[in-house]
Every structure is written in structure tokens, then in C-alpha cells.
Amino acid sequence: MAENPNVDDLRAPLLAALGAADLALTTVNELVGNMRERAEETRIDTRSRVEESRARVAKLQEVLPEHLSELREKFTADELRKAAEGYLEAATNRYNELVERGEAALERLRSRPVFEDASARAEGYVDQAVELTQEALGTVASQTRAVGGRAAKLVGIELPKKAAAPARKAPAKKAPAKKAPAKKVTQK
């Protein structure tokens, strides 16, 4: 059988193209695997942080009455009120910082198209963490107010009635990041 020189001339470029396609496929598969690992790590990390927050809130609920009884013994009603206001302000400031940080982190995640699924799950976890934090903040505020009221009664001071809480403004939901259109390939 006579060999066709034209087939031999095309063999090397065709094999090179096949090798390049195989390399590209392998690289894409590795990238997808890495992205899946990172998404899973992020999900696990977020879940563990939520669980840690729940544990801290539970511990705070256990320890708070002890701390409040110690404070009741140490402080007068005015000192107790000032301390409670300081704690409430510090907790509110920290909470607001965490909200801002969470929003920034969510925007960074949303800006990466490969993490859209992971960011959607993370957003759910963030919402859960925010709800837990709000519950904890509400519990701390109500218990602090109750202790202040009891301390005032013990001392014989009448506290002003609790003003109606102003309506909280719900944080604006941000639209999901839009995908950039695919680049057009021009032939030369």
C-alpha cells in the first residue's frame, strides 16, 4: 500500500490540535474540580460559623443572668443603666459592622460567575446568621431592660416607659450580578 504524502503532512498538525484540545479539557476539568472544592469549603466554613454563633448565643443566654446578678450587686440603678446602654451600643455597632462586612463579602462572591450557586447558598446562611444575631441582640436588650427595671424598683426609682420602637428599615435586596456577554471570536 502506497503511503499518501498528503496524509502524512496533515498527521502532525491534527495530532497537535487533538493534544491541545485534550490539554484544554484536562485544565477545565481541574478548574471545575478546584471550584467545587472551594465552594464546598465555603459552605462548610459558613455552616460552622453559624453553629459557632448559635453556641455563643446559647452560652450568652446561660451566662447573662449570672453577669446581670453580679452587676445588680455592684452598681446603682444609674450606673447599671449607663453600663447597659454602653453594652447595647457596642453590640449594635458590632452588629452593623458585621452586616456591612457581610454585604461586601456577598458582593465579592456575586462578582465571580463560577460561584453563583455557592453565593446563593451562602446568602441563605448569611440570612440565618443575621436572624440569629438579631434574636440575640433582642434578647440582650430585653434582658438588660428588665434588669434595669428591677434594679430601679429595688432602689425606688421610676424609669421612663419604653418608647415605641421605630420601624426598622429592611435592607434592600441586591439584584444578582449579571453575566458578562461572551467575547466574540473573529476569524482572520
Curated annotation (Swiss-Prot):
Residues 170-188 have a biased composition (Basic residues). Disulfide bonds: none annotated. Residues 162-188 are annotated as: Disordered. Might mediate adherence to host cells by binding sulfated glycoconjugates. To M.tuberculosis HbhA. This is Heparin-binding hemagglutinin homolog. It comes from Mycobacterium leprae (strain TN).
